[in-house]
Amino acid sequence: MSNTTVEQFAAELKRPVEDLLKQLKEAGVSKNSGSDSLTLDDKQLLNAYLTKKNGSNGGTISIRRTKTEVSTVDGVKVETRKRGRTVNIPSAEELAAQVKAAQTQAAPVRPEQTAEDAAKARAEAATRAEARAKAEAEAAKLKAAKAGNKAKPAAQKPTEAKAETAPVAAETKPAEESKAEKAQADKMPSKKPAEPKEKAAKPKHERNGKGKDAKKPAKPAAPAVPQPVVSAEEQAQRDEEARRAAALRAHQEALLKEKQERQARREAMKQQAEQQAKAAQEAKTGRQRPAKPAEKPQAAAPAVENKPVNPAKAKKENRRNRDDEGQGRNAKGKGGKGGRDRNNARNGDDERVRGSKKGKKLKLEPNQHAFQAPTEPVVHEVLVPETITVADLAHKMAVKGVEVVKALMKMGMMVTINQSIDQDTALIVVEELGHIGKPAAADDPEAFLDEGAEAVEAEALPRPPVVTVMGHVDHGKTSLLDYIRRAKVVQGEAGGITQHIGAYHVKTPRGVITFLDTPGHEAFTAMRARGAKATDIVILVVAADDGVMPQTIEAIAHAKAAGVPMVVAVNKIDKEAANPERIRQELTAHEVVPDEWGGDVQFIDVSAKKGLNIDALLEAVLLEAEVLELTAPVDAPAKGIIVEARLDKGRGAVATLLVQSGTLKKGDMLLAGTAFGKIRAMVDENGKAINEAGPSIPVEILGLSDVPNAGEDAMVLADEKKAREIALFRQGKYRDVRLAKQQAAKLENMFNNMGETQAQSLSVIIKADVQGSYEALAGSLKKLSTDEVKVDVLHSGVGGITESDVNLAIASGAFIIGFNVRADASSRKLAENENVEIRYYNIIYDAIDDVKAAMSGMLSPEEKEQVTGTVEIRQVISVSKVGNIAGCMVTDGVVKRDSHARLIRNNVVIHTGELSSLKRYKDDVKEVRMGFECGLMIKGYNEIMEGDQLECFDIVEVARTL
């Protein structure tokens, strides 16, 4: 495509054919019509001519500088005068930001402005943009001239790309003007489309054809300099670039046309909205000020003929009217302030008033938009802590507190604005009001614990396994453990049953094993769950002569929930009734399959009494431990779990701690739940004082501030201040959560109990030696409650019975249960004086049975009918003023005067009532036995007939039991 016609080249450059022919003639190329062909040499001659005509002269450029003032009024820094023009050139970034701000803040043109004013405003804006572009071009020309002095050959040699892209540079707008037009295309479309991007490759001093030097007559064209012929590859590349440039121009023209149409529609809609707003404002103004004509808002209001107007008042009204039209105080602002509030729309006129220093005529910037409040609802993401007040919740959702209270009342909660609600209720309220509720992250001191755990890294070493012995009551768990320990623990337990979690560690030839002995009674479910939580391996003890029992099934469930492996010890195989195969079958039904049957559970037949296969059981436990590869860091702060806790009168709070990792030392600062303190003493399970304990070793510790809850995690902290802070925070958090839930529960109970008779309540105060015992006892007693009699555990705690417990019993009418504890002398004396009953127990069965008997005594007795005799009516005697008298024969039993009677006719009960009189002959008698005749009357009933039978019975009360 080396030869093209003049018409094609003109179409490619988007220039008229006549202008291109004229420039070709000036360059020395003789072409007469648009159909003449153009060669590459012709194009290069034209390029050389235009470069010389519009390019640099090689000398210095002098720029006349005039001093003037620039007024800045929240827009582009430009002031136009009649004779001279001074331009303050911002940077490209500032220019783009200012143009964007001017477009977004411009107020729409008032409807009464003519089309000529709008065109004049657009022309003025285009002139300002052109002036900025020319100034930038002059600065760039000066800079390029300096660079040209240093390297003239490079400046004078035009690039080959300019030959096709810049033949008409004298009439081409600078690139900066194109950028300004593109930025203003949304609000102020340009008359000319943007030039191709290839023109931006030209130096600024070559593109600027509208500078001061361009006004001078052009010099005659220099003779053409012969240029080397380009290769075919370069020509193909140029053709491809030209094609892309043409496609880009077409795309830009389409975009510009679309923007112009969109702008026209927007202008029409704005004008229509302005007219409607203006009409509404004029109607409103007409109602407020009838003395002012609505047709001429600029003129002063004339006086009404039938009503005199005060001159001062009229003057003030006139000034207000001028202010409404933007010609009052706002028009005379000094120093560019333009009045008190230029940025706010006044009386619905969305115009921005611009003032000048000398109070010149106003300039109204069109397309300025006033602020509009958001109409769409705002959805907040609300983080809800454990407890939150109603006021804080409303603040987080940015709504009024009344709305939150209203929503809670709809849910049935009568709350005040300062009342606390729990997290679950708050999340429901947040969702109800259309926001997104999420539980808040732990923004509390406990986050310090996680950071500290990550910071400490120590080498993990092998540790002993923790083995929990579980099973049904009386299946021989503790006896099995006794044989392993060679001790007699069962004899020390009351009733021969375990009522505490015992923690022991045993040294075997193959290593150390830590055992946890859990109670098998159903009341100690929580203890068994804690034992399974802290364990590595579970030994499930099943009696060979008893089989699978309820607590055996529960122990299997705990082990599966904790995800720990099991070893089944089939105990009591030395008994005659032992049947180990039946045990295997029953356990298989509960998904505990022996390994010899293809399962993964080891079954060992043992006898705790004779010591059979005990070594095989330990071997199986250690084999499971090897498979688990149990490790824990040793040289690190200790972490563990509270297995049991109690309050000792002489030593204070005593807790049994199973160390799970690290080394616990005497004097460490320990945090366990809401309790903390420095360890003052440590003893092992044999009562021997020790100074440190490693992983998987159980110890008793002294020195905590309070009795911790069994099952709490414990860890050593380096700072007592931090431990105190975390413990106090937990206490407050638990208290708030508990109170919030109690309040909700009270309201629920109030509605549930509405309309029901009040049930009797048996109040109990429980004091036990360890926490696990009073937990089990309180849970068992609450299970005894019925609809008629309820057990109310007012208080339960660890330690001996004190005077405060007795005083609480006096105030509430409760009795006190002491489980393995006693009352001191002062408490006993106070209880005797106030008739407070204190009962001591050391076996949980006895306590449950006595409470059950007391509850049975509180039940209302049951009424039963007891038949005493049968009577046959043989004659009916009617006596006036008395009624019908039945002459009867007692056929069975005895008839008493105060008995109840049931009238039976044809084996159908006709009436049930009482006897009013009983006589034998004429004498009143108390009773008549079988075989004797008597006369009787039924109270309030006379419809008796011969042949009827009377069944006499008494109502007796029978005591009920639970």
Curated annotation (Swiss-Prot):
- List where in the cell it is found: Cytoplasm
Which superkingdom heads the taxonomic lineage of this protein's source? Bacteria
Pfam families per the UniProt record, alphabetical:
EF-G_D2, GTP_EFTU, IF-2, IF2_N
List the residue ranges of the region (G3).
517-520
InterPro entries given in the database record: DNA-bd_dom_put_sf (IPR009061), EF-G-like_DII (IPR053905), IF2_II (IPR044145), IF2_N (IPR006847), P-loop_NTPase (IPR027417), Small_GTP-bd (IPR005225), T_Tr_GTP-bd_dom (IPR000795), TF_IF2_bacterial-like (IPR000178)
Residue ranges of the region described as G4: 571-574
**Domain tr-type G: residue ranges:** 462-631
Q: Which UniProt keywords apply?
A: Cytoplasm, GTP-binding, Initiation factor, Nucleotide-binding, Protein biosynthesis
Please give the residue ranges the record annotates as the region G1. 471-478
Q: Where is this region: G5?
A: 607-609
Matching entries from Gene3D superfamilies are given as:
P-loop containing nucleotide triphosphate hydrolases, Putative DNA-binding domain, N-terminal subdomain of bacterial translation initiation factor IF2, Translation factors, Translation initiation factor IF- 2, domain 3
Specify where the region named Disordered lies, as residue ranges. Answer: 101-366
The record's region (G2) falls at 496-500
Composition skew (Basic and acidic residues), residue ranges: 117-141, 173-216, 235-269, 338-354
Q: Which SUPFAM superfamilies match?
A: Initiation factor IF2/eIF5b, domain 3 (SSF52156), P-loop containing nucleoside triphosphate hydrolases (SSF52540), Putative DNA-binding domain (SSF46955), Translation proteins (SSF50447)
Positions with a binding annotation for GTP? 471-478, 517-521, 571-574
Q: Which family does it belong to?
A: Belongs to the TRAFAC class translation factor GTPase superfamily. Classic translation factor GTPase family. IF-2 subfamily.
According to its UniProt entry, the function of this protein is described as: One of the essential components for the initiation of protein synthesis. Protects formylmethionyl-tRNA from spontaneous hydrolysis and promotes its binding to the 30S ribosomal subunits. Also involved in the hydrolysis of GTP during the formation of the 70S ribosomal complex.
Q: What is this protein called?
A: Translation initiation factor IF-2
